[in-house]
Regions:
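A short beta-loop-alpha structural element at the N-terminal edge
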Residues: 3-17
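Conserved GNAT acetyl-CoA-binding A-motif
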Residues: 112-124
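Acidic/histidine-enriched, glycine/proline-rich intrinsically disordered or flexible terminal extensions
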Residues: 168-175
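Conserved GNAT-fold acetyl-CoA-binding loop/helix
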Residues: 18, 22-45
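Conserved catalytic-core motifs of GNAT/GCN5-like acyltransferases
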Residues: 74, 79, 121-124, 136, ...
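Acetyl-CoA-dependent GNAT
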Residues: 35-94, 105-106, 165-166
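Conserved acetyl-CoA-binding loop-helix of GNAT-fold acetyltransferases
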Residues: 91, 97-110, 129, 133-137
Length: 175
């Protein structure tokens, strides 16, 4: 499948990202959310990514259709976590199983290294075996499970954490 990696923008990609988010909210446990998001949510989401200097990486088809995207953001708000980020990857339902999630995640890892981060963390629903397998193939280690922290579709949901340690930054500093 021919595709290209792109830096997503609000103007070009917000509607497609919103569709992918809302499908995940309404049909899966990939997002522990109940209500579909709005365009206003996307304005705030893109603004937060821009203010934090966080990438929003997409995969487009030759025709310009957004097939997958991913991003990362702060793992926790306190300053000592400045070298740690939490990422997410979403693939449009029509394009799953084609390796696009891997392409996005590899791009996020490269961006984290370029930005001198030290660890990238994924919080994954424990039943999402495809995402877990992808993370394990790329060297992420299972570092913990939080049992029954979510409730959706009439079921308690377990959340697993996968972490990849990077060799960057070379000279970390306090403060």
């Amino acid at each position: 499948m021919e595709h290209r990696v792109v830096e997503c923008t609000f103007e070009r990609h917000a509607a497609s990202i919103l569709d992918i988010f809302n499908d995940a909210i309404l049909t899966s446990t990939a997002l522990y959310d109940y209500k579909p998001r709005s365009t206003e949510n996307m304005v705030a989401w893109f603004q937060a990514k821009a203010e934090g200097g966080f990438p929003v990486i997409g995969i487009e088809s030759e025709a310009g259709v957004l097939m997958a995207f991913g991003s990362y953001g702060s793992f926790r708000a306190w300053p000592a976590y400045k070298y740690s980020v939490e990422h997410s990857v979403y693939v449009h339902k029509a394009y799953r199983g084609k390796g696009l999630g891997r392409v996005v995640l590899e791009q996020l890892i490269a961006a984290a290294q370029k930005n001198d981060l030290h660890t990238i963390i994924g919080a994954i629903d424990a039943t999402n075996t495809a995402s877990i397998a992808l993370h394990e193939r790329l060297g992420f280690m299972h570092v913990g499970t939080l049992p029954q922290v979510g409730f959706k579709f009439g079921n308690w949901l377990d959340l697993v954490f996968y972490q990849l340690l990077l060799s960057t930054p070379r000279d970390p500093v306090d403060g």
